[in-house]
Amino acid sequence: MSVTETEFTDAVRSAVQDRGALLYLLIQAFKEAGCATDEPVRKALFRFGQLSGARLPPATTPRAFFDGIGATGKAGLPFAREEMSVDAAQGVYHLHRCPMVAAWRNLGASPEEVVHLCELAGCGDQGLISQFPELTMHFNETIAKGDAYCAMVVARNG
């Protein structure tokens, strides 16, 4: 069976959106039950990121990292990922879509909740990058905070 690029993009975007919805609903259920949620959620998402990062090829440069996560191929399509600059020291990608933010907003999360959920979800990104000790990752802008895109920055340590 052949899948078009649009079908692939829509399917992966939908899966990421479902993951975002699940995160939101779990946190809401924990809150309703009177459970503190942030610390266990942060730990679980960080560990999930570590597991994801462990499956990726080794990388010691931003280019190798982005190639390893498929940023330069079809894997970036659901996020409308755009390479801005990548050199030996730093790589910057703009992600023009975030299916998780879309899910949270569709479920009625307040702007403050969306920012908080994004910060929690970022623990997964930090877990992933932790598997690459030569690299760091941060987001200068985020769709959750109202920016036009998420600016993913991966840099070499030191």
Spans of model-derived segments:
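N-terminal accessory segment detector
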Residues: 1-120, 134-149, 153-158
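Amphipathic alpha-helical segments that form well-ordered structural scaffolds
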Residues: 120-128
